[in-house]
Each structure stands twice: as structure tokens, then as C-alpha cells.
Amino acid sequence: MSNENQAIGDQVTEYVTVMIGGQLFGLPISRVQDVFMPDRVTRVPLSAPEIAGVLNLRGRIVTAIDMRRRLGLPPRTDDKPSMAVGIELKGESYGLLIDTVGEVMKLGEDTREPNPVNLDARLARVSAGVHRLDGQLMVILDVDYVLNTAAEPMAA
């Protein structure tokens, strides 16, 4: 193995795992500011459908993004409370509303793969690659893409 390949094999990324609509996602831990249960979300009139609203998190105004809507998935049918992952982009705070938060996983960059050709197009749009875990595919969430496209105003 060359030195360059050895360096890639030694690189490890930590991911916060989350479930959205039965799909496992990994968010690079370096991007995650908070994990919290959203309290009151105030709807914002005329906002994009995936913008659930805004909330107050320890004195900060946070834009809440409904990841199920963002991915084109049906709304939850259970009564379990949503969780949120706090992310920051360009000085703005966002809360990605998700179903559940899992564990933190350390995964080697050498096991990261490009999107499989049969990956659902809704997932492929927001994916920065995948890791194959024991019988499950973890989609690496491209946080910048999700936030940049959610923040863009809709064309009139």
C-alpha cells in the first residue's frame, strides 16, 4: 500500500447517526452543534414547505427544517416527539428535525463509498456518499447541500 493510500486508510470520521423515515443517516460530528428536543416551533408564513418554522434555543433563533418534507417522505404517524440536530451555516443556526438520534460512530474513510446506482433519487440528492454497515446502508448527509437548498427562496 502506498503512503497516500495508507494515509486515507488511517483517516477516521465521526458521525452522529440519525433516523429519518426508516433510513439511517450520518452527519459529520464536526458539523453538529447541538442535539435537542424542539419545544415550540413557530410557523413562518409564506416559507418553503420544508421550513417547519423557527424556535428559540437558549436565546438563539433557529430555523427548523423538516427533514421528512425535505426528502419528500410522508409525515410521521406516531406520537413520538421529534428530535433535532443543530447545525450552523454562514452564521445562521438551523435545526434539522429528525425521527431519532442514534449513536456516534467512528468510520474509516477507506470504507466510504460513492452512492450506489440504485439509491433512491431523493436520498442521492442529499448524499455525500455511503457506508455499508451490518446489514444497513448509512447515507452521509451533505449538510451544506441540505441547508443551501432549504435556504434558497422559491422561484415565483
What are these regions (language model features)?
Residues 1-156:
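An acidic, low-aromatic, low-complexity terminal/linker signal
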